[in-house]
Amino acid sequence: MDHIRNFSIIAHIDHGKSTLADRIIQICGGLSDREMEAQVLDSMDLERERGITIKAQTAALSYRARDGKLYNLNMIDTPGHVDFSYEVSRSLSACEGALLVVDASQGVEAQTVANCYTAIELGVEVVPVLNKIDLPAANPENAIAEIEDVIGIDAADATPCSAKTGMGVEDVLEALIAKVPPPKGDAGQPLQALIIDSWFDNYVGVVMLVRIVNGTLRPKDRIRLMATGAEYPVEHVGVFTPKSKNLESLSAGQVGFIIAGIKELTAAKVGDTVTTVKNAAPEPLPGFKEVKPQVFAGLYPVEANQYDALRESLEKLKLNDASLMYEPEVSQALGFGFRCGFLGLLHMEIVQERLEREFDMDLITTAPTVVYEVVQRDGTTIMVENPAKMPDPSKIEEVREPIVTVNLYMPQDYVGSVITLCTQKRGVQINMQYHGRQVQLTYEIPMGEIVLDFFDRLKSVSRGYASMDYEFKEYRASDVVKVDMLINGDKVDALSVIVHRSQSQYRGREVASKMREIIPRQMYDVAIQATIGAHIIARENIKALRKNVLAKCYGGDITRKKKLLEKQKEGKKRMKQVGSVEIPQEAFLAILRVEDK
């Protein structure tokens, strides 16, 4: 046990987390040079392309330290984005230490701070590392001062290294061994293992990535998952050295995988505790919570006959992403599709992109919404997570929207612009505290304002330094209305949005003018209207395309021309009655991007 070190790497996007991981794997000889490639642990194409880590990955490495002893290092690579903060907290709770990687040229950034606070709360030993010191712009003194100032941990002995060139990486490992405590736990106790992550493999079913806290697990043991109570026989256990390698047993302190012929990923919930049926653990490990989707959107296939394929693709994605929820829904404008729940906007984009890329789906996505509580005149209360299901305004007594408590951390230079942003988003300030140069702001903001683009706007007004985390507080009565879009008098249900009354006029006008730019001109006039109930708040017209029917007339009587023009007019009128306007895919996407100015 004394020679095991479990650690993860915390870093902001692009501070060199995956490159450092590559170097560590190379030094410890986890892969031969032939198998070595950039970003070994980011196995999804999408992860490589966006340069982000989505799923947690692990590598069990052995390293002979300078004191001559052989240490087992278990590296758990964590995602860094706020949408995946639950995944981060579970990866961290499986470790005793974390390498805090800070770009020496950029200093501390927001997501580093958020994840670092999570680590400190979980009692993880944080080891600061300055990366990219080979850059001419590197300023290690400033970065050290920032770590001490912002995060408040002692960084005087932060290890400088450059993951790209490989210099100093061994010093990082030495610092890790010196500072991070070995895992606690007793191999003789009943089994308790924390599920860090789980994914579906086409050959063996669900693979669970676990950290054994107490006890020992061998193949042929029967295990029970404590959140669901389901029982399975264990087929294989082992570790990843990034390649998988079967072992005889996994015991306390180790990080490895369990394969137990589980067919459904929903059975192996991330954060759940695994124990054995015989000699079961009395209680599960703390910190497990069901992940609730925060953002809903409709996903529809562009071709109606792709509906079954979309359902299969969602099922397959669900195998690897337990936080994705979906249920079938029908829209008049878009046909059959699914209402999906996501953790946040990045999660939504990633799911969409994976559907398009890995499963060749063509998708239409509706605007993201949150769940509203609607009290009707007859006294019943319904939950509305889809604008199309919002009752008529005449039947509504009041609408309550979800309010979240948002904690924001930022350097004091940006306080003004962040406060302005929160006020625009109808936020109410609850608290404000100064910690050195850092400021903590607490706001109550309607969730509907946050899902649209709050995070991106926050990052841009604070140059990426502000970090936020939010939790649901309550439902609160609010003056929100549903804005419907009509095209030639027909309601397009997929374009309905629920907004606050103060923004409804603006929003309606914006969407209408956006649609006017995007919908191609037809052979007849098209009227675009935005309405609240029966009240029209904005209108745009798309003028008809017309053929020049007079081109063939030379001279001659005016009545001849009039006859041709009248005939054209008649035809247009007839067309308008039978014609339907196709809304191109871009229109939906553009409408999602109508920002609240």
Swiss-Prot record:
- Amino-acid positions noted as binding GTP in the UniProt annotation, renumbered to this chain: D14, H15, G16, K17, S18, T19, N131, K132, I133, D134
Give the domain of life: Bacteria
- Which residue ranges does the record assign to the tr-type G domain? 2-184
Enzyme Commission number, as recorded: 3.6.5.n1
- Main localization is membrane
| Statement: the UniProt record of this protein carries the keyword Cell membrane | yes
What Gene Ontology molecular-function terms does this entry list? GTP binding; GTPase activity; guanosine tetraphosphate binding; ribosome binding; translation elongation factor activity
A GO CC annotation recorded here is: plasma membrane
* Annotated disulfide bonds: none
Alphabetized InterPro entries for the sequence: EF-4, EFG_III/V, EFG_V-like, EFTu-like_2, G_TR_CS, LepA_C_sf, LepA_CTD, LepA_IV
Q: Which GO terms describe its biological process?
A: positive regulation of translation
Where is the protein situated, by its record's location annotation? Cell inner membrane
Q: Which Gene3D superfamilies does UniProt cross-reference here?
A: 3.30.70.240, Elongation factor 4, C-terminal domain (3.30.70.2570), Elongation Factor G (Translational Gtpase), domain 3 (3.30.70.870), P-loop containing nucleotide triphosphate hydrolases (3.40.50.300), Translation factors (2.40.30.10)
Question: What keywords tag this UniProt record?
Answer: Cell inner membrane, Cell membrane, GTP-binding, Hydrolase, Membrane, Nucleotide-binding, Protein biosynthesis
Catalysed reactions, as listed in the record:
GTP + H2O = GDP + phosphate + H(+)
Q: Does the keyword Endoplasmic reticulum apply?
A: no
The top EC class, named as a word, is: hydrolase
Membrane topology term: Peripheral membrane protein
Q: What biological function has been recorded for the protein in this entry?
A: Required for accurate and efficient protein synthesis under certain stress conditions. May act as a fidelity factor of the translation reaction, by catalyzing a one-codon backward translocation of tRNAs on improperly translocated ribosomes. Back-translocation proceeds from a post-translocation (POST) complex to a pre-translocation (PRE) complex, thus giving elongation factor G a second chance to translocate the tRNAs correctly. Binds to ribosomes in a GTP-dependent manner.
HAMAP family, per this entry?
Answer: LepA
State the family named in the UniProt similarity comment for this chain: Belongs to the TRAFAC class translation factor GTPase superfamily. Classic translation factor GTPase family. LepA subfamily.
What protein name applies here?
A: Elongation factor 4
| UniProt organism field | Paraburkholderia phymatum (strain DSM 17167 / CIP 108236 / LMG 21445 / STM815)
Q: What is the lineage of its organism?
A: Bacteria, Pseudomonadati, Pseudomonadota, Betaproteobacteria, Burkholderiales
Q: Which gene encodes it?
A: lepA
